Amino acid sequence: MLFKKIRGLFSNDLSIDLGTANTLIYVKRQGIVLDEPSVVAIRQDRVGTLKSIAAVGKEAKLMLGRTPKSIVAIRPMKDGVIADFFVTEKMLQYFIKQVHSGNFMRPSPRVLVCVPAGATQVERRAIKESAIGAGAREVYLIEEPMAAAIGAKLPVSTAVGSMVIDIGGGTTEVAVISLNGIVYSSSVRIGGDRFDEAIISYVRRTFGSVIGEPTAERIKQEIGSAYIQEGDEIKEMEVHGHNLAEGAPRSFTLTSRDVLEAIQQPLNGIVAAVRTALEECQPEHAADIFERGMVLTGGGALLRNIDILLSKESGVPVIIAEDPLTCVARGGGEALEMIDMHGGDIFSDEI
């Protein structure tokens, strides 16, 4: 215990956004020090037993869909929570070590991890135990919408109601925040991954071709749009896939309209969650939100025109936060500082 405390003196306090698609780590006075895909490549023996970790993060993501039989590239997080405990722990261990690469001692940091608002107690305990197993000496949990709101510079400590929509890789969190607490929250298991899956299904159905996750993600980023207005440029992209009928590679052209048609269902799920939040929040908070608007955070906020879609469907102004991808990790870092100043009970529902 004493040795762990001594190691702690040589470790940074970390805010970790442990996401389905990416893991970000924020360090006080240094900012975002790590932004890596939440992917681990593992070596297996002939019966499928784990032998060793082959790669983590960017290097492992490059292996998705390209590995030999002896190596499997997996995502240990699903829908914002742990799907593979052992691999998540190894991934966290690797990332924490990366952040402390100059240290001569094994790191033992104080860690704050951001969790989905809809995570169960069992899922929260798994995240906490995984962080401790990865070397953390002390672990705090904070709900992602609260961290996102702090990172987006919303006035979370005042009585004014602030609404945040955090669209991550696995989940979309919709929350109303006031007086350092979440007064309304809902979490739908729809995010960037669902958009990618919808594009893969659409290509298979419409063009009879198979594409992988990395290609679907590239399509979404390059020509994807949540709403097409009159006068908008219709982007096109040549896509290479594997034709099912011919059993050979084939190229075809996709447009922004195709992508919009493909992702319509997950978009409808996010719109429905936002409408429900506006219907169910307290009248005074609703008035604040209609006056001040809703704030979009997370990687999903980068999907072209998603702010326009949500504004048109809800009748409320929508603002995309500055640097939406890092809002949760940065907000978690600020939350750690608030805990130091006011104690762990400042976010009584989360910590």
Curated annotation (Swiss-Prot):
ATP binds at residues 20-22, 169-171, 217-220, 299-302. One of its GO terms (molecular function) is ATP binding. InterPro entries: ATPase_NBD, MreB, MreB_MamK-like. It comes from the Bacteria. Its main location: cytoplasm. It holds the Pfam family MreB_Mbl. SUPFAM superfamilies: Actin-like ATPase domain. It is found in: Cytoplasm. The keyword ATP-binding applies. Keywords: ATP-binding, Cell shape, Cytoplasm, Nucleotide-binding. Forms membrane-associated dynamic filaments that are essential for cell shape determination. Acts by regulating cell wall synthesis and cell elongation, and thus cell shape. A feedback loop between cell geometry and MreB localization may maintain elongated cell shape by targeting cell wall growth to regions of negative cell wall curvature. Forms polymers. HAMAP family: MreB. This is Cell shape-determining protein MreB. It comes from Haemophilus influenzae (strain ATCC 51907 / DSM 11121 / KW20 / Rd).
